[in-house]
Regions:
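Duplex nucleic acid-engaging cores and interfaces of nucleic-acid transaction enzymes
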Residues: 38, 44-45
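N-terminal Sec-pathway targeting helices
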Residues: 1-10
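Short, ordered beta-strand-loop transition motifs
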Residues: 86-92, 176, 240, 309
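Aspartyl protease catalytic domain
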Residues: 110-263
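Conserved hydrophobic/aromatic beta-strand scaffold that supports enzyme active sites
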Residues: 95-99, 171, 204, 235, ...
Length: 329
């Protein structure tokens, strides 16, 4: 595990201080403090050590380490990826996972020109792509959930309620304080003032770090191409430290996809889109959305998918400047 150090030094007589930090990362990171104080007639100094949280390698018979995808940012590593074989009995089936540090990123949601479904005349659907204003700090983009016609679900972003929230459904939310979570929705049809983004899709797939009982009912998790039970599936989870984990894998039932997410140590997870056409996770090699690369090797997708007008809604991950800031629009 790589360690990053934050050092605070205070010199009393010299009236000099300095602080080296990465903005607002600490609330989701594990820390250990070991103060060391030395005294003399001239100065006093205190050193505080902080260990930055990194996810452990994914180990299923063999261990698969995480790879940093945003070294060009020259800041806290915020998007890491790995691939692994979730079930040793089927070694040809590989799962692709991305870990997103929520304390140093902004998770944003964008409508496409078809999804979410038809809305009232005059409703602002936004840029329907990654806007130019956000591209200098764009780190990743990935697919969202079902069309509303395929599963009624709430959709809220940029102070606009495109579809009302549905009680009991799995919901990814971003709050005004910058925190992100995946929850079972128990609120009103319209999110409260402390929520800046909310997207629902079906019930929870994983809860309390275990597959939910409903995950065993494959018919409850969407129509599959050709009616086969095991298809490409994607999911989004939250770990115990409050960081997001996206995963995509072929040949999965709802139940096996839930197991994939538990192998990634999520506390809760929701299924996103399914079937071969939709899985996509893109990383970027430089500021300005340069060097777009498909992390999930889907021949039905292209790296620049969300840099142009998109049919379906999608998520974008930006390097954060301050907690809870409005997403680029």
């Amino acid at each position: 595990m790589r360690r990053y150090w934050v050092v605070i030094a205070v010199v009393t007589l010299g009236a000099t201080g300095f602080l080296l930090r990465q903005a607002h990362q600490a609330h989701a990171d594990s820390t250990s403090t070991g103060p060391s104080t030395t005294s003399s007639s001239t100065s006093t100094s205190m050193v505080t050590t902080t260990t930055l949280y990194r996810p452990a390698a994914v180990c299923v018979r063999v261990c698969s380490p995480w790879r940093v995808m945003d070294p060009w940012l020259h800041a806290v590593p915020s998007v890491l990826t790995t691939s692994f074989v979730p079930f040793p009995a089927t070694p040809s089936v590989v799962a692709y996972a991305a870990w997103i540090r929520t304390s140093s990123t902004d998770l944003s949601l964008y409508p496409g020109y078809k999804g979410p479904g038809p809305t009232a005349a005059g409703v602002d659907r936004g840029p329907m792509m990654v806007p130019a204003s956000g591209r200098p700090r764009l780190l990743a983009t990935f697919n969202s959930g079902f069309y509303e016609a395929d599963g009624a679900a709430g959709f809220y972003v940029n102070h606009t309620l495109y579809f009302p929230m549905v009680d009991g459904l799995a919901t990814v939310v971003r709050y005004t304080n910058g925190r992100v979570d995946i929850i079972r929705w128990t609120g009103a049809a319209r999110p409260g003032a402390n929520i800046v983004m909310a997207r629902q899709n079906l019930p929870l797939l994983v809860n309390a770090s275990k597959p939910t009982p409903l995950s065993a009912d494959n018919a409850a998790w969407g129509l599959t191409l050709g009616g086969v039970p095991a298809v490409w599936r994607t999911a989004l989870g939250i770990d115990a430290q409050g960081n997001l984990i996206y995963a995509a894998a072929p040949s999965q039932t709802a139940a096996s996809m839930a197991v994939v997410m538990t192998r990634l140590h999520v506390v809760r997870a929701m299924q996103l889109d399914i079937n071969p056409e939709w899985p996509i996770f893109v990383t970027y090699g430089a500021s300005g959305a340069i060097g777009a690369t498909l992390f999930v090797p889907n021949p039905n997708q292209i790296p620049g998918r969300f840099l142009y007008s998109s049919t379906k809604d999608f998520f974008a991950v930006y390097a954060s400047r301050r907690p809870g800031e409005a997403q680029p629009w």
